[in-house]
Amino acid sequence: MPRRRVAAKREVLADPKYGSQILAKFMNHVMESGKKAVAERIVYGALDKVKERGKADPLETFEKALDAIAPLVEVKSRRVGGATYQVPVEVRPSRRNALAMRWLVDFARKRGEKSMALRLAGELLDAAEGKGAAVKKREDVHRMAEANKAFSHYRF
């Protein structure tokens, strides 16, 4: 346990176009090497593509996609008497969002479309419909937790 005080959580400023804190945080996940303007261009470009493809509100689609990706439970390794058990634990809301954003960006980067904006738009639309690689990752994590339910009494 740390001896110092716990660092205060900094508030993220809402993004200028949509006024959403979650979107601003997502831009920080997309950003590489401190290039925020590039990250903004990618995210706004992706949301414009989502709007083009007939979805009414791109921000609503984005939030729906995040909900579809965010895991409810995950497994943590716990060592008990020489054996390591995968113990299912509930995921904190802040970690849920962080994992969802991380998975969304990671799997968007692995897609085959030309630009990152197109890849991100494709992954967002897939996730909002309950399919795509990021949603599959969530299902895998849930399946792992379900398989190790027997060890849930080894709480943290």
UniProtKB/Swiss-Prot annotation:
Cross-referenced InterPro entries: Ribosomal_uS7 (IPR000235), Ribosomal_uS7_bac/org-type (IPR005717), Ribosomal_uS7_CS (IPR020606), Ribosomal_uS7_dom (IPR023798), Ribosomal_uS7_dom_sf (IPR036823)
Superkingdom of source: Bacteria
PROSITE patterns per UniProt: RIBOSOMAL_S7 (PS00052)
Single GO cellular component term: cytosolic small ribosomal subunit
Pfam families in UniProt: Ribosomal_S7
GO MF annotation, one: mRNA binding
Function description: One of the primary rRNA binding proteins, it binds directly to 16S rRNA where it nucleates assembly of the head domain of the 30S subunit. Is located at the subunit interface close to the decoding center, probably blocks exit of the E-site tRNA.
PANTHER family xrefs: RIBOSOMAL PROTEIN S7
Family indicated by similarity: Belongs to the universal ribosomal protein uS7 family.
Self-association state and partner proteins as the record states: Part of the 30S ribosomal subunit. Contacts proteins S9 and S11.
Protein's name in the database: Small ribosomal subunit protein uS7
Taxonomic lineage of the native organism: Bacteria, Pseudomonadati, Pseudomonadota, Gammaproteobacteria, Pseudomonadales
